[in-house]
Amino acid sequence: VRSSAASDVYKRQQILFTSLDYDDYIGRIGVGRVERGRVKKNEPIVLCKTDGTQENVRVSRLYQFEGLSRVEVDSAAAGDIVCISGISDINIGETACSPDCIEPMPFIKIDEPTISMNFMVNDSPFAGREGKFVTSRNIRDRLFKEVETNVSMRVEETDSTDTFKVSGRGELHLSILIETMRRQGYEFQVSRPKVILKEINGKTCEPMELLIVEVPEQYVGAVIEKLGSRKGELVNMGTRDGGATHLEFRIPSRGLIGYRAEFLTDTNGNGIMNQVFDGYEPYKGEIVTRERGSIVVHETGVSTAYGLFNTQDRGRLFIPAGVEVYEGMIVGECAKNEDIVCNICKSKHLTNTRASGSDDALRLVPYTEMSLEQCMEFIKDDELLEVTPKSLRLRKRILSKEKRLKQQFRGK
């Protein structure tokens, strides 16, 4: 008795592309499963595109996977996962068919971007120290290369040659790109994430998410409280086998920025969450994510235990002693709703009655080490996140205190 895959070999070919890859030499590569028939190298096929049009193309190269590597083959049969090159504008969800039997499969819908950030050339005083790729040309080429395979991402050039607008499916989507780039040696800075708003029937609408959460029963209250403060609406609740509670929320996309780290903390790592785009709805109003100001560095230098000791009563610190800092860099969160400028590089003046090692006796409160996602949520519109292979630094857009005050005066 033949299996269904074996019997499909004798039918007309049909390949559904579910992923993309890219090679600098051969260009874009479509990855998909041969649903039926057999595909051969150099044979003509018809590509059924997502907009309903058809394009006659040829299989210039055909690959299959062996472990993690691609191996070139002459043919593949139904059931095989193949990689096909020679189609320059192929996209996910499109179908390759035999010219004699054009039957496209149902298209896979790709969610549109909901959140955008600006990627900029790093212009801080420490620019170029830690990164290998630092110029606007390097950053531009890397971002547009990402779009070749990451179909949910959009990259646009702006009026400034040093700034690129990158739109993605959410905070996690963009943070993965940022982390990947810094591991590859790129150095740049990013702005605060913003949701992509739309005008629908004369109303300003924002993207919504269906958030599905499973947590142990003892953490349900904390999760509902946090999501409620982020404009989340509980639409379904149930119990799973084993004592887990199933929760479903409808929540604005901006309400989930920075929440994943909070969720893991609130559930002690025992919770599971997943989100799906759920359309656009009228703007839900302001979501308060940070009511406090920033602790900003007064001058360039190295942080000292004495300087941090005199600053720690003003709020929460993000760095230890012995870290290089520059004017305008953010090193903590102020306890009040205002920015304060502190000199954390200040050291004791040595006298006959003060030993040089007296700083060691100062007792510092443990500092908070911020993750990438926490940094992305923390920054305000007048702040930036500096990303390098070795460091994540928060900073003001305008580094000079005098220039910031002039800007505030002009704004008033």
Locations of the language-model features?
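Solvent-exposed alpha-helical segments within well-ordered globular domains of core cellular machineries
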Residues: 15-19, 33, 40-47, 57-64, ...
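Single conserved hydrophobic/aromatic residue that forms the stacking wall/gate
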Residues: 1-6, 10
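Short, hydrophobic beta-strand segments
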Residues: 113-129, 160-167, 200-214, 240-254, ...
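Conserved nucleotide-binding/hydrolysis modules and their immediate coupling elements
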Residues: 16-117, 127-129, 163, 292, ...
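A short, contiguous, amphipathic alpha-helix enriched in charged residues
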Residues: 124-147, 365
